[in-house]
Amino acid sequence: DIIISGGENISTVEVESVIYSHPDVQEVAVIPVPDNKWGEVPKAFVVPKPGREPKAEDIIDFTKSHLARFKAPKYVEFGELPKTATGKIQKFKLRDREWQGHRRIN
């Protein structure tokens, strides 16, 4: 996915790669979510490593320290990720939920 936020292109893979390197993160999926000001912004869905309890601000600040600030997720949600039987993350399920009632332009 490419997120277009205020005219800037943000690669979800690039953001995920940085968040995966956070010591408290086991899994992550980043998707675009609607935003009234920027059109779309990144949102990260994070599965913490067992016994770890990172805060949303920790993930956002960590990402900002490795990428341009506008690429950091505006929102972080913790919990399990929807997956296929083979273990692939089903980002479309996350997108469908977040975009319910909105229309994605790009």
Question: What spans do the regions from the language model cover?
Answer:
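AMP-binding/adenylate-forming catalytic core of the ANL superfamily
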Residues: 1-71, 80-82, 87, 93-96
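Acidic/polar alpha-helix N-cap and adjacent early helical turns
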Residues: 98-106
